[in-house]
Curated annotation (Swiss-Prot):
(6S)-5,6,7,8-tetrahydrofolate binds at L118, G122, H123, L124, E242, S350, P351, F352. Catalyzes the reversible interconversion of serine and glycine with tetrahydrofolate (THF) serving as the one-carbon carrier. This reaction serves as the major source of one-carbon groups required for the biosynthesis of purines, thymidylate, methionine, and other important biomolecules. Also exhibits THF-independent aldolase activity toward beta-hydroxyamino acids, producing glycine and aldehydes, via a retro-aldol mechanism. It comes from Syntrophotalea carbinolica (strain DSM 2380 / NBRC 103641 / GraBd1) (Pelobacter carbinolicus). Belongs to the SHMT family. One of its GO terms (molecular function) is pyridoxal phosphate binding. The modification N6-(pyridoxal phosphate)lysine is found at K227. It catalyses: (6R)-5,10-methylene-5,6,7,8-tetrahydrofolate + glycine + H2O = (6S)-5,6,7,8-tetrahydrofolate + L-serine. This is Serine hydroxymethyltransferase. InterPro entries: PyrdxlP-dep_Trfase, PyrdxlP-dep_Trfase_major, PyrdxlP-dep_Trfase_small, Ser_HO-MeTrfase, Ser_HO-MeTrfase-like, Ser_HO-MeTrfase_PLP_BS, SHMT-like_dom. SUPFAM superfamilies: PLP-dependent transferases (SSF53383). It is found in: Cytoplasm. Coiled coil: none annotated.
Amino acid sequence: MSQTLIQQDPEIAEAIRLETERQEYNLEFIASENFVSEQVMEAQGSIMTNKYAEGYPAKRYYGGCEMVDIAERLAIERAKELFGAEHANVQAHSGSQANMAVYFAACKPGDTVLGMNLAHGGHLTHGSPVNFSGKLFNIVSYGVQKETGYIDYEEVERLALEHKPTLLVVGASAYPRTIDFPAFRKIADKVGAKIMVDMAHIAGLVAAGVHPSPVPYAEFVTTTTHKTLRGPRGGMILCREEFAKTIDSNIFPGIQGGPLMHVIAAKAVSFKEALAPEFKEYSTQVVKNAKVLADALVKRGLNLVSGGTDNHLILVDFTGTETTGKMAEKALEKAGITVNKNSVPFETRSPFVTSGIRLGTPATTTRGLKEAEMERVADWVVRALDNMENDTELAAIKGEVREMCKRFPLYAHLLK
């Protein structure tokens, strides 16, 4: 145990070094990614990784849990304070598992669930046929209006009245506009449905008060703890007190065994960070940056789903052109800008090709980039898309990107 990682496992040590270098010298615009603080990393890499703790604080199936109970209680109380929730379960290993637990708490297999179409901005766990949600439940999907790119609330109401879902799933993984939670509540009440809001993408914005909160309008709210919340990779469920026992039992022993106590400790650290005034400033800047970047891309001739953004996310639509999302993603990666190919509403191409790319500003805002840098990024994006076959030009952009990254360091000291 006295050896360093580079001595004991040089291959993994080198992979970590190269990944640190990639994050340090490229601009991360994948909307679901962010950079955690070194304090979050310290907690996640702590000795708490050694401890098994099946159960919940003060009700464990193992001894020696006094200290991990402290960490989990802190995570729970901070999460409740952050979102104004009556109950929080912080044990979910991921957003998908948080969603699964809510499905099992609210529905029986075969029940009807109304959720957002994946191609229109939803998530795999909102009813995709390749996912457990699509296999175990009768899924009805709603989408966005073709003309506007906004959620079609009239369609949601029509489908709800027609199919009488047990659960109405709200939230998205690629929807750039503010979601009208009161409108969904009214629709759900007309048919006696419960609501699960998956706020994984916007949780940090909600915590900071720069996006409306779903908590007052939904029986269940799920989220990841990374993305805009800027914590470790993991999941969480918020719910009303009346559903606390069924949610907890559907996480453990329902779908999980032992919780990841080192991750829960890191969640607690990130929640404390999100309660600080600086986090509101950060989240406000995330949205400012996204709006400036969206406007700059439109001015430079790109088409955006819904024409812009209200949150952290931008969806570029190449429909009607020869450019595909796959081509754009590869070209931008060569230019030092990381994005992901993404299906767009009314998609005609394969999910492996797509007609769009998704960009988000949480990670670059964490670096310290602001409006002026977003204008520069828009220039680079358009230059890269105009020169997708020109490796020399893409390499030139990458060099310029690297210089900007040096001005806004992340973990540069870890490379010394």
